[in-house]
């Protein structure tokens, strides 16, 4: 089932971030940093955060943001990340999460979605081939 995020999901999202997210290249985070970068970020909204729940377990999530204060935020929504557990990481589940997020953007009057550096939710990732060197604004969707 795809549904909106609730604060009770925060621990599950952090776990997904530090397991599946780090395999995608995102930098590992403790709870305080995760909150600052995502769940308590000023542009975070439960309206634009969706979870994939199966038999009571959160197996994935997608997050995005929008707003008139963001460059072109009056017409587009920004996709921050899509992270799925290894057991749920399928094209179908990715499509379900993205569809929920894009539908929420449409309901808010946005005409298209973007994965770009204009997104104010800047998620740190590890530069490939380095011993943990971070960059602060990763596109949040795998390219393969």
What do these predicted ranges mean?
Residues 72-87, 118:
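Conserved acetyl-CoA binding element of GNAT-fold acetyltransferases
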């Amino acid at each position: 089932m795809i549904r909106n995020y609730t604060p009770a999901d925060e621990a599950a999202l952090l776990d997904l971030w530090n397991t599946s997210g780090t395999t995608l290249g995102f930098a590992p985070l403790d709870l305080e940093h995760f909150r600052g970068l995502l769940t308590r970020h000023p542009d975070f909204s439960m309206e634009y955060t969706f979870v994939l729940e199966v038999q009571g377990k959160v197996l994935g999530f997608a997050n995005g943001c929008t707003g008139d204060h963001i460059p072109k935020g009056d017409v587009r929504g920004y996709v921050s990340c899509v992270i799925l557990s290894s057991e749920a990481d399928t094209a179908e589940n990715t499509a379900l999460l993205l569809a929920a997020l894009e539908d929420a953007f449409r309901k808010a009057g946005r005409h298209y979605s973007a994965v770009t550096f204009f997104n104010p939710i800047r998620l740190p990732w590890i530069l490939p081939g380095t011993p943990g060197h971070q960059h602060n604004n990763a596109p949040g969707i795998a390219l393969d």
